């Protein structure tokens, strides 16, 4: 819990306010940067607010113009839970439609990856990309489900571009098996240098990390 109410008082429970019931003006009035996050003690405490996806896209697009590399991409997670449909989030089809609407005008040279743990969301993403500019679909996998690769693929109903498990349950055998199926492997959430090195040795195609500065420094060694 790291948010602050408009009156300066801290938000004490994640159930205290349902932002799905607020308009954006109300959401923006909550600070989400000054209190800091206990999980990231080195993070600078800066006054901030939850931006719109469109604002993030505009910021990234402007930054890309000054970026020397042609390789540039967006990796967006659609956080979704079936028991939260119409409670704290839209139904999957509406959710996906709202996100794709914001992504529609992005330069086609920008690579887009859309990921989720929710199979319903992933299935809609897969069906909708036929009428949309191409993007990769990434299946985020809970640790307890990672040993059931084939049954999860069967449940999903299509071959995702990327398989994203928790890094702690990965093995060389699993990575090789997924590669044989033509599926990239990008585990989450790899924060320690030693674990980054291990994932590289396993043959992973990338990692998800809270510390890109560490990853960049490691790669440059």
Language-model features: where?
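C-terminal active-site rim and adjoining tail of enzyme catalytic domains
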Residues: 132-221
């Amino acid at each position: 819990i790291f948010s602050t109410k408009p009156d300066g008082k801290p938000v004490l429970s994640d159930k205290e306010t349902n932002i799905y019931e607020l308009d954006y003006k109300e959401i923006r009035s909550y600070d989400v940067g000054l209190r800091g996050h206990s999980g990231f003690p080195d993070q600078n405490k800066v006054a901030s607010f939850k931006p719109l996806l469109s604002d993030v896209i505009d910021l990234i697009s402007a930054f890309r113009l000054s970026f020397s590399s042609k390789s540039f991409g967006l990796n967006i997670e659609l956080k979704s839970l079936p028991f939260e449909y119409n409670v704290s989030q839209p139904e999957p089809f509406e959710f996906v439609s709202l996100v794709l609407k914001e992504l529609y005008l992005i330069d086609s040279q920008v690579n887009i990856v859309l990921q989720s743990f929710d199979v319903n969301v992933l299935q809609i993403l897969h069906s909708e990309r036929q009428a949309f500019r191409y993007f990769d679909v990434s299946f985020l996998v809970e640790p307890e489900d990672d040993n059931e690769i084939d049954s999860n693929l069967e449940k999903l109903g299509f071959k995702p571009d990327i398989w994203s498990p928790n890094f702690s349950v990965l093995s060389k055998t699993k990575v090789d098996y997924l590669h044989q199926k033509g599926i990239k492997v990008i585990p989450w959430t790899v924060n320690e240098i030693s674990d980054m090195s291990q994932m590289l040795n396993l043959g992973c195609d990338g990692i998800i990390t809270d510390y890109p500065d560490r990853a960049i420094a490691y790669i440059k060694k």
